[in-house]
Amino acid sequence: MDLQTALAEIKRGTEEILIEDELVEKLKSGKKLKIKAGFDPTAPDLHLGHTVLINKMKTFQDLGHEVVFLIGDFTGMIGDPTGKNVTRKPLTREDVLANAETYKEQVFKILDPAKTTVAFNSTWMENLGAAGMIKLAARQTVARMLERDDFKKRYASGQSIAIHEFLYPLVQGWDSVALEADVELGGTDQRFNLLMGRELQKDEGQKPQTVIMTPLLEGTDGVQKMSKSLGNYIGITDAPNDMFGKIMSISDVLMWRYYDLLSGLSIAGINAQKERVEQGTNPRDIKIELAKELIARFHSEADAQAAHDDFIQRFQKKALPDEIPELTVTIEQDSILIANLLKEANLVASTSEAMRMIKQGAVKLNGEDKITDTKLEIAKGSTAIYQVGKRKFANITVA
C-alpha cells in the first residue's frame, strides 16, 4: 500500500492528529512503528463505542506496525477521572485482573493475537516505587493539572479532587516513556493525558509520540455517546438477534457514521455503498449488510445469517411500511410518559387521544407489542417504532 493510501486509512474517522507532519515522516522512514492504546479494565464488557479505537489499532496492524494493547491494571486501581465530576472508586487488584482477562478475549475478535503485544502497566509502575512516583509528580504543577476541563469545573464548583487523580495523567504519560511509543491512540476525551505522554517523552530525550484521537461514537439514539448507563449501547457480547435489532434501529444518517467508524470496508467500499443508495437502493438493505458484518465479526457468519433471517421474518410479519419517519424527542427528565411522547411525535392530537387509543389497544411498539399501560414511562436513550392505529408510524428516539 502506498503512503497516501495508508495515510488516508489511518486518518479515516479520526478527530485530530497531533502532529500529522510527524506521522508522515515516521511512515516515510519505513520503520515498524510501535502503536500504543491503553485500556483501564474498569468494566468487563465492551460495546461498539470501545471498538472505534480497537479498529484503528487493527488498521496499523494491517499496515505492518507493532500494536501494543496496554491494560492499565495499575491505573485501573487509581481510577480515571476523565469526564467525571466526582472521584471514581478505585478497583481492587482482583477486579482489575478478572476484567483484564475478559477484555483480552473480546479484543481478539478484532485484533490478530499473534501480532498483538499485550502489556500491563504495573510492570514498570510498581518498579518505580514511592521515590520515583514523587519525582514523576514533580514534573508538573497543580496549575497545569487544573487546565484539564473536568478538573477545572470541579475546582470552580467547589467539588473535591483527590491528590491521586492528579497522578493519573502522569502515569498514562509515563506508560508512553516506558514503551517508547511512536503513536498513541485515544478518544477525544483523553486529549490532556495523551499530550502528557509527548511532554514526558521529550523530557526523557525520546522522540515525542504522535497522538491520534478518535471520536466518541454516538449510541443508538444518535445524540449522546454510546454508554451502558444511558441504555443506548450495542454490546459486542449481545446476542446476535439483539445486536441485529439494535443496529437496524439506528437512523439512516447515523448508519454512515457507523460504517465510517466500525466497518471493515475500505473508504472506496463505503463510497460504493453510498452510490447504491443514490441510485435507489433502500438504505435499510445497506444497514442490513452492516449488521451482518458486525455480527459475523463478534459471533459468526452463521449467526449473522440466522439473525438476518429472523429479523426479516419478524419484519414481514409486522407488515411495517418500508419508509417510516425518524424523529427525536428531547426531554430534560430521565423518562417521558407514553401519552406525552405520542403527542410530541404528532402521532396524536392530544394526550387524551393518546390515552384513549392506548385503552383501545390501538398503540403498538415495534409493530407487534400492544401498549396497554397508560402510565408507561419511556426511558431516555431508547429507540423504537411506535404505531397508532393502522396508518401512523414513527421511529422515535428519546434523547
UniProtKB/Swiss-Prot annotation:
Record-annotated S4 RNA-binding domain positions: 336-398
Gene3D superfamilies documented for this protein: HUPs, RNA-binding S4 domain, Tyrosyl-Transfer RNA Synthetase
SMART domains for the chain: S4
Sequence motif: 'HIGH' region, positions: 41-50
Protein origin, superkingdom: Bacteria
One GO cellular component term: cytosol
GO molecular function terms listed in the Swiss-Prot or TrEMBL record: ATP binding; RNA binding; tyrosine-tRNA ligase activity
Motif mapping: 'KMSKS' region: 225-229
Known catalytic reactions: tRNA(Tyr) + L-tyrosine + ATP = L-tyrosyl-tRNA(Tyr) + AMP + diphosphate + H(+)
GO biological process: tyrosyl-tRNA aminoacylation
Subcellular location: Cytoplasm
Transmembrane segment boundaries: none
Pfam families named among the record's database cross-references: SYY_C-terminal (PF22421), tRNA-synt_1b (PF00579)
Keywords: Aminoacyl-tRNA synthetase, ATP-binding, Cytoplasm, Ligase, Nucleotide-binding, Protein biosynthesis, RNA-binding
Homology family: Belongs to the class-I aminoacyl-tRNA synthetase family. TyrS type 2 subfamily.
Subunit and interaction comment: Homodimer.
Function: Catalyzes the attachment of tyrosine to tRNA(Tyr) in a two-step reaction: tyrosine is first activated by ATP to form Tyr-AMP and then transferred to the acceptor end of tRNA(Tyr).
NCBIfam families the UniProt entry points to: tyrS
Record protein name field: Tyrosine--tRNA ligase 2
Lineage: Bacteria, Pseudomonadati, Pseudomonadota, Gammaproteobacteria, Alteromonadales
Gene: tyrS2
